[in-house]
């Protein structure tokens, strides 16, 4: 039997590990991580959403690394969406603050902004998480971050569902010199099939943009023990590209969807162009 739009992810996979953390606490955690590493908050108003961002302290440089957050706390239980998708563990922010180069962090719509239900209906962290207006807004924010930091080229780094966003944004741009994903959900159709979940009917899917992505060098880091976004999702994405495409995947032993990307990130960063 086909399941509903289940909460696949941190809480969907391990409900016992989801200790209560209210939204103000989640916001405070991210701000503490950012402040500790001298990242400054710079929220961005786009046509459709107000997006939370943090900009690193490095000197302005030609290349900006933009880290895009995952789906966050999208589900309260396996079948019930949360009231606010602000992450309980901001993995992409943990990675961004470890980057010694010019870096910025960009949250997803409705994360960290305490938005109303009118501004942020639940569909934007469930079925429509990769909707055209979401990608439009993220792309607009990336352009503004690029201007704020004086960059002329971009490396987009997406964690989990942020990997899909990074790919879809990269497909719309000509200034992305590398696409990087960490435990990235690069094919949500394959992902929902694997988990026997309802499709993300309002969302764009990265493989459909392969022609725009084929010329961009790509590196995808995958946890061998990741049961949330297993390697099969990457393989489904990769097969739409020609063999000659500059796409590299590294499958890391003893790593799952969450653990232990921050510990490994300084070493993995050295592999990037």
Feature roles, as predicted:
Residues 119-148:
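Alpha/beta-hydrolase active-site loop
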Residues 239-273:
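C-terminal catalytic histidine-bearing segment of alpha/beta-hydrolase fold enzymes
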Residues 27-58:
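N-terminal cap/lid segment of alpha/beta-hydrolase-fold proteins
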């Amino acid at each position: 039997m086909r399941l509903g739009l289940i909460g696949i992810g941190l809480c969907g996979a391990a409900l016992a590990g989801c200790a209560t953390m209210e939204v103000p606490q989640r916001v405070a955690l991210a701000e503490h991580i950012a402040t500790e590493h001298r990242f400054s908050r710079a929220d961005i108003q786009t046509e459709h959403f107000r997006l939370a961002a943090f900009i690193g302290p490095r000197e302005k440089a030609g290349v900006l690394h933009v880290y895009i957050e995952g789906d966050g706390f999208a589900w309260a239980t396996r079948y019930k969406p949360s009231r606010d998708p602000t992450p309980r563990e901001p993995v992409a922010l943990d990675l961004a603050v470890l980057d010694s180069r010019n870096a910025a962090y960009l949250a997803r719509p409705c994360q960290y902004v305490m938005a109303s239900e009118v501004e942020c209906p639940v569909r934007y962290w469930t079925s429509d998480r990769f909707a055209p207006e979401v990608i439009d807004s993220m792309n607009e924010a990336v352009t503004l971050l690029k201007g704020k930091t004086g960059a002329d080229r971009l490396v987009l780094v997406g964690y989990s569902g942020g990997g899909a966003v990074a790919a879809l944004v990269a497909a719309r741009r000509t200034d992305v010199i590398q696409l990087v994903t960490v435990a990235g959900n690069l094919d949500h159709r394959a992902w929902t099939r694997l988990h026997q979940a309802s499709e993300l009917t309002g969302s764009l899917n990265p493989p459909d943009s392969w022609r725009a992505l084929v010329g961009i060098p790509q590196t995808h880091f995958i946890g061998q023990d990741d049961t949330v976004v297993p390697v099969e999702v990457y393989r489904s994405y990769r097969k739409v590209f020609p063999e000659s495409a500059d796409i590299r995947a590294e499958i890391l032993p003893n790593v799952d969807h969450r653990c232990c990307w921050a510990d490994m990130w300084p070493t993995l960063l050295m592999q990037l162009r």
